[in-house]
Amino acid sequence: MQKRYEKACIWEHRHLSLMKFRKSHREEVPVSMDDTAPSAPEGAAPAASGPNDAPADPAAPRYKFPTWFDLLALVGLFVVIQLVVAFVLLLAGARMPDAAALGSADETVAARAHAAAAQFNFYAYPLTMGLMIGLTLIYRRLRGGNRRLGRYAVRGLNPALILWGMLLMAATNVVLEPLLQLLPEIPDFYGRGWRALLLTVVMAPLAEEFLCRGILLDAARAKGGAAYGLLFSALFFGVIHFYPAAVVNAFVMGLLLGFIYIRSNSLYIVVILHAFNNALAMLLLTLGYAHTTLYELMSAHGLKMLYTVVYGVSLGIFLVAGYMVWKTIARLREQEQAAAEAQ
């Protein structure tokens, strides 16, 4: 009986010691992960329950991919793939887009050239992006990168969030227009017709968002944090568009799409917004306004004052978005540093 009593006392003493240890541990970490989750930015749609941009698990492995060397390697890989695909298609009898015919004053010649360009791109683009995505996944694995294949939160289908993103994309296009006019024009190699529409509005958003945001942004974020992931993916997205005006435009759009992806935790919304942006571009091409600025269009109708108002509002939206990006990245960096210190 005495032995049973002594064992019970020993067990109770151990239990009390364990409870004290747990209590002291909780007191050392007064803020939970949920408390550190940033609130939704002003003007954005209401956030879904639970944090959507919490820092990575501090116990997660340290990844080697991607570095800035990897960025150069991936861009080089993309160029090589494009050249190989073009060479194979030429051997198969395909015709490269003819710049002279595309810009011909003869409408019949131009229409045939645009149809041929659309047909060539319709085969070249999916082959190029399919190979690029596959080889990037292999390269990422060999280099020791995070293996996530994107995030697909249903919040990305929130209509209010989508409308906010569309407004932001449209405003950004207006703000960038004067700067892009200082750079050489982007050649019109896209073509016309249903093939060009399907390629730019469906294929390109799906493939490029999966590669740039789903694979590269997540991998870079796992390695160096949200700011690194955002910058890395936007740079790659910009550089692979090659032409100076397209590079600048794609880089800025890449920053915005990356920010929205981080905030929403969803590829759905960035694919939709990318498709919306490309659809606007295709609409302008189809209507014959490919090289006409909004300023020129509105000035021709005596609406210079209205353009000033539109540009001012767009600039305000753009600056607010930039502030939101900066605040979100700063907050995430604090969380990532806190997680690293707690490791």
Language model segments and positions:
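Functionally important transmembrane alpha-helices
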Residues: V79, L83-F87, A246-L303
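C-terminal membrane module of polytopic membrane proteins
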Residues: F276-Q343
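Hydrophobic residues within alpha-helical transmembrane segments
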Residues: M203, F232-F236, I272, F276
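Hydrophobic core of alpha-helical transmembrane segments in multi-pass integral membrane proteins
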Residues: Q82, M129-I138, M166-N173, V309-I329
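Membrane-interface helix/loop boundary segments of multi-pass membrane proteins
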Residues: A207-F232, F259-S266
